[in-house]
Amino acid sequence: VVGSGVAGLSASMSLSRQGYNCILVEKAGSLGGHAAGYTCKAINGKCQKCGACLVDDLLARFGDFPEIQVFLETRIDRITRKKKGFTASLNGKGGLKDISCGAIVLATGFKPFDPNEKPNLCFSSIPNMITAVELEAMLRDKELPYRPSDGRQPETIAFVQCVGSRDPKRGHPYCSQVCCGYALRMAGRIRDLAPKTKITFFFMDIQTFGRSFPQRWASLQQDFIWINEIPGDYFVSDGDRVGVSVEVEDEIVDLSFDMMVLSVGMTPTDDQLTYQQMLDLSMSSEGFMLPDEDRGVFVVGSASGPMSIEKSITDAAGSATRVIAYMEGAR
């Protein structure tokens, strides 16, 4: 199993539970992937079902599976197909090591879109413009957001949706599915802890999430300011505020905020191409890996496309059934 995010952990435990020997390879120095850095978004003590706690739960339960071999800070240099199964050459802090396996589960996850790929955002030159990933870390560490320029708590915050998603020019025509959910939950968390904070959303449209969303939408419209447009120009305004030019009621106006959060989408990882070439895998229309399950290669979680934490866990657990079917048939 390659990758120890929620999908990799879920797949490993599901397979181990059925008596299969699992080897978990992770290039980072710890387990959990991106989701291990996410924060609880409960409002007034009520769970918002963001999935962040599911990661902690998986990591806690992973301790019950000491039989799973874990290689941290390890990369795979080469994968060779054999008559039955594969040989993978591992390169890690313990040196070089070849391992044999009957099937490969790629749970390599995703890469958050890099705003520097969109020059009009001026991301590197606007100090109080951050990504939603950075906001997650802020809320997990300090509970409340703060401006990177001076550490002050912002009184006004703008969220810009669909950054790096629904963007055919950048090769990302798809919706990342999770951005609206995480942005609205974090905005709600901030308002719960700092009720006077004014929050504005720049959006194309809103991706619904959760069964209760239609009922909640009315209150969300009242809680935040909604501007149905994505700004084209971004600049530093007075007091290190983030300025934007936007059309409001047929007139171009400049608005400014203490801080701006870019709701970045999910893109394929940098090492995806390496695994595609090693295993002769095809690519989906969205640019993510396609599995080759008839030949023992399975792709799970967000390695196969944008996916929430909860869906990644269930997808990986479900794929374990197919891995077992393949292994039984290959014997």
Where are the language model's segments positioned?
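Residues forming the flavin
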Residues: V1-R331
